[in-house]
């Protein structure tokens, strides 16, 4: 129970932190773009194979679908319709980067909790180590736009940032649930050093993704 509670607690805190960062980076998507699919994909991957609970995979899948969809539109193979699968790749990179940055922090802070001793035979010698298996559910909010012809909005103007008003669209926040996980094993490092190194690498990858998307 304590392990589950800690996963829920750190997951909620991480989700709030991620939402703040996404808002600061002005990450937004059109409501018709189905950006929420990235969270659904991560949950499906978690069910199929926990080691693939990674938004890099989910983002790559959704980004590929968006690119193929737009190529088909440009080739006049399908009608554009609304903003279906119109996903700004820069915003998608920042979204994936922020989630990875937060994931790295989670791994460094909470990744060693619940680790179990394991043993293996290497070159005829029995060695002991630790196995890690953690999954955090992160509730996150995203700014979603919906193009409107009606100039009147129920959202108080004083509560809407200028960068949202400049789009000429109706904006709203929606909550999504994503899963990030950490599954690894070590026979050469201590529990603390293993999660710190892994967390640093994951966060560094996230920072690179953010810089590419900015």
Where are these regions (language model features)?
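Hydrophobic transmembrane alpha-helices and their immediate loop junctions
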Residues: 1-214
């Amino acid at each position: 129970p304590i392990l589950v509670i800690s996963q829920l607690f750190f997951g909620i805190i991480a989700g709030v932190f991620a939402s703040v960062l996404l808002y600061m980076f002005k990450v937004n998507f059109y409501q018709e773009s189905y950006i929420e699919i990235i969270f659904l994909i991560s949950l499906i991957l978690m069910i199929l194979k926990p080691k693939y609970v990674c938004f890099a995979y989910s983002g790559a899948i959704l980004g590929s679908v968006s690119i193929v969809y737009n190529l088909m539109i440009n080739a006049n193979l399908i009608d554009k319709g609304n903003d279906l699968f119109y996903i700004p790749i820069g915003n998608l990179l920042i979204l994936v980067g922020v989630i990875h940055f937060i994931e790295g922090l989670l791994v460094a802070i909470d990744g060693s909790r619940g680790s179990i001793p394991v043993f293996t035979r290497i070159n005829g010698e029995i060695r002991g180590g630790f196995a890690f298996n953690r999954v955090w559910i992160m509730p996150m909010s995203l700014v979603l736009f919906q193009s409107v012809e009606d100039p009147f909005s129920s959202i108080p103007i004083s509560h809407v940032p200028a960068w949202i008003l400049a789009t000429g669209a109706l904006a709203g926040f929606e909550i999504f649930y994503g899963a990030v996980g950490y599954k690894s094993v070590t026979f050469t490092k201590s529990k603390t050093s293993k999660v710190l190194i892994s967390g640093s690498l994951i966060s560094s990858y996230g920072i690179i993704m953010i810089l590419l998307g900015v």
